[in-house]
């Protein structure tokens, strides 16, 4: 039995994403260090970093999801709107709506701009689609 690729979505056009160089390096390091424990989401995060347009760390990225951003997004399947803060794993706390970048939702949101949507597959092989409604950095 072959394993389905976590980020397998050949028919879907992925939106362009923008990430600061220093964050991309830290996120690549995180994906590498977590590859054994969380192989699917680590691979997804690494793929997102590979395709990201990198900008200088002092760039003005208003409206772009980055680490520490407060994000309002809509689950396109359910219509549910959520407000979260995107954080590193050690800062995650779902009761405070602090979502780790090392979750499928967190990895999907990083680098997106307001109005962009992304489709991805969860570890349970469910397809999800999220649209970013607002970002404050």
Where in the sequence are the language-model features?
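Contiguous hydrophobic segments
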Residues: 3-11, 90-94, 133-137
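Generic serine detector
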Residues: 2, 8, 32-33, 53, ...
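Non-DNA-binding regulatory cores of transcription-related proteins
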Residues: 68-70, 77-130
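Extended, charge-rich alpha-helical interface modules
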Residues: 47, 51-69, 74-78, 82-91, ...
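N-terminal intrinsically disordered, low-complexity, charge/repeat-rich segments that act as generic
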Residues: 1-64
């Amino acid at each position: 039995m072959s394993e389905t690729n976590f980020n397998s979505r050949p028919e879907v056009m992925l939106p362009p994403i923008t990430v600061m160089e220093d964050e991309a390096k830290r996120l690549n390091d995180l994906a590498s260090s977590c590859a054994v424990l969380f192989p699917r989401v680590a691979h997804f995060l690494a793929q997102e970093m590979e395709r990201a347009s990198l900008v200088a760390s002092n760039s003005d990225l208003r409206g772009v999801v980055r680490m520490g951003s407060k994000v309002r997004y809509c689950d396109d399947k359910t219509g549910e709107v959520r407000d979260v803060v995107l954080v590193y794993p050690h800062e995650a706390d779902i009761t405070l709506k602090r979502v780790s970048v090392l979750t499928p939702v967190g990895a999907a949101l990083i680098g997106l701009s307001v109005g962009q949507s992304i489709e991805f597959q969860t570890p349970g092989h469910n397809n999800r689609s999220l649209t970013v409604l607002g970002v404050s950095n």
